[in-house]
Amino acid sequence: MVQKAIVILAMQPIFGPLRTKLGMVTRAFFAQRDLNNVKLLEEFYETLESGVHRSPAKDKSISSDEDGNTLYMGTSIRECVHKWRFRTLMLLKLILLQKRIMVYGYPVEHLCTLQYSLVSLIPALLPHLQDAAAPELNTLSRDRVKAESLRMSDRDSLLAYMGLPLPLFSHDAFFQPYCPLQQIDNLRCKTWLIGTTNQIFKHQKTSQPDVIVDLYKMQLSFLDPTLHNLVSLTPADRKWMDDVINVVQSTWNSADPAQPVQMQYKGSDDYLRARFEEYVFGLLSTAKYCELH
């Protein structure tokens, strides 16, 4: 049996908006039972193209917040916090420290969703992954200009002043939510975040991970014991994270885990993303203060 697939190659990780559309088109296309009839695919392509030309990345009249809202579709911070609880903050710390992180398990959709949800916790990072596909790419750092002023009413100005986006997946770094064996050589770089369902990645010796995130066992396995101590939560971290977890638990909707009860703002992904943004801002401010004093 020959398997066929329809694949979208996109410049931005807009998987949430594309997933539903692609599913419907794929089912309709194969239901025709005529692979030579590609009119449906041509119309789908034209629809996507027109959407891209009106996307936030192309249209400067659309705010970065709207841009983010489009990219964040398909991620679920609520489910991440609900499942991983205090370990959510440990995973965030591991990414910020640019460690080698391997996420292992099935299904692939959950594998990828967890990684994109974690990356989305870091302000402005998800829309700036242009260097993540190969360790030798470094456009984000090369094109960076130091902010000389701050306009508090302008979110883009605030992000730039805080040094964002952080070049976490730029030079000598690699991010591949579902990594094929053909890219295993990229794991020789300094830092990476990958997802895999293949045990070969877990047992290869040349580029071992610092930590393995096991979706089956819901646990973090540290190959370096000192790293566990490094990312362990401080009393202040635990208190802060406890508040976040309580908000998620008190608004949990088992019928629709992605949305809080009564569709309120508190407990939503936007609310949680704002809380984690405050955490990252506080972390960066503290690091800068320590550097200057």
Language-model features: where?
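Acidic, Ser/Thr/Pro/Gly-enriched alpha-helical scaffold modules and adjacent low-complexity linkers
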Residues: 1-293
